[in-house]
Amino acid sequence: MDKNNNNLRLILAIALSFLFIALYSYFFQKPNKTTTQTTKQETTNNHTATSPNAPNAQHFSTTQTTPQENLLSTISFEHARIEIDSLGRIKQVYLKDKKYLTPKQKGFLEHVGHLFSSKENAQPPLKELPLLAADKLKPLEVRFLDPTLNNKAFNTPYSASKTTLGPNEQLVLTQDLGTLSIIKTLTFYDDLHYDLKIAFKSPNNLIPSYVITNGYRPVADLDSYTFSGVLLENSDKKIEKIEDKDAKEIKRFSNTLFLSSVDRYFTTLLFTKDPQGFEALIDSEIGTKNPLGFISLKNEANLHGYIGPKDYRSLKAISPMLTDVIEYGLITFFAKGVFVLLDYLYQFVGNWGWAIILLTIIVRIILYPLSYKGMVSMQKLKELAPKMKELQEKYKGEPQKLQAHMMQLYKKHGANPLGGCLPLILQIPVFFAIYRVLYNAVELKSSEWILWIHDLSIMDPYFILPLLMGASMYWHQSVTPNTMTDPMQAKIFKLLPLLFTIFLITFPAGLVLYWTTNNILSVLQQLIINKVLENKKRMHAQNKKEH
């Protein structure tokens, strides 16, 4: 039984190692793929007719590009700039806040090469960060289901009430299509959310069926391997996700409250305050099968939008439901609570690094009762190791008798052979929740901690934290009771600190800080428990001697 327990602990440790390998490969290895970018001419040549009730992303394309290339209006903010083109679309959004202007992180080998090179390693910051791709579907593009009307709309530029404006100012965009006029009224705010009203004028007051899009997802974080695609939520709070390359057919969603296109840090979205929601259509981009979102409309519309960072507090201030745009995978329900706690701690200490350390301390306190039981159990197993070895020798070749006597021994001394594994198992979901939070949180981008850590969202530039993590893990092993009787298992366990150091060396510094702090707290906790158990053992021996 003891051997089985040791095997289980070894399997868990190795499983964790392989999970780290998988994470490393998934998040940090660049896949061998090329992005297919369909030119306007290719789009025209490959055009196929589709049902007018199910508009394809390329269904309304046109080779007339002159109006699309003209800049119509510019909205300027303190930390951003938005451009509107001649088709009444958001042509580009530029962020000017310095936290988004740090240069792209180098790959591991390139970084190491520069680290040991005499050449200047610093890269100049960006002047501004564009969020949208130049050749992709633009937010606020209107498409009509009538092909003739749609073609005319794509060749007729809008007029604007203003060419330059600031936050809280109203912009009226008008497109005259002869018997029909479209009026878009826009008001942009400092937090990058906006109000949108779509109205029509026609002699017969008839409004043709049309769609409007929130646009193709931002492309400011192309090397990220977190969720990228379309995410929407309906009135029942059910969230639907369509990832890049997975849009294989047109999908319809009724009672939709918000429609968003996201990458790791940024989003472009449309939402409504009407509890009945709207009908959303998810189509596929030709060539890539990346999802494209549309809202199907038959009347005039009052909508709201946002385009910018997935900052939790900003989104919550606009509308609490928009915080669901921040996606953490299968453990979102748990990870969101972790982030809320982390954000609260940040508000308290004013530094994300110290907030991570406080979060780690809180997690250790919550898990302390189970950790204590596990450590006590491991200490008891260590003390029973000589007796267990005797039983293994005595009942060699008789596994059933050996197991029965082992269980009697455990019961007599109150030892739990699985007690040391439980804390390790419980830390797995906690670790992955914290991992997703620290990797996805745009709040950590360009966030300093101390000294050499100037950005907690990227790897430690000098690999000091990963080395400290490995050393702390080895230290933890040295103070933890060793219940292994198999020399090979013991050798494998000794290699784990080195293995984890290699896996974590390119992980975000914030995550490595959490793991290092967790190891140090585990060591301190183990030393305290060892001292407590030693005192109890001494007192027990003294009482036994007196009697």
From Swiss-Prot:
It comes from the Bacteria. The keyword ATP-binding does not apply. It comes from Helicobacter pylori (strain ATCC 700392 / 26695). The keyword Protein transport applies. Gene3D superfamilies: 2.70.98.90. This is Membrane protein insertase YidC. Interacts with the Sec translocase complex via SecD. Specifically interacts with transmembrane segments of nascent integral membrane proteins during membrane integration. HAMAP family: YidC_type1. Required for the insertion and/or proper folding and/or complex formation of integral membrane proteins into the membrane. Involved in integration of membrane proteins that insert both dependently and independently of the Sec translocase complex, as well as at least some lipoproteins. Aids folding of multispanning membrane proteins.
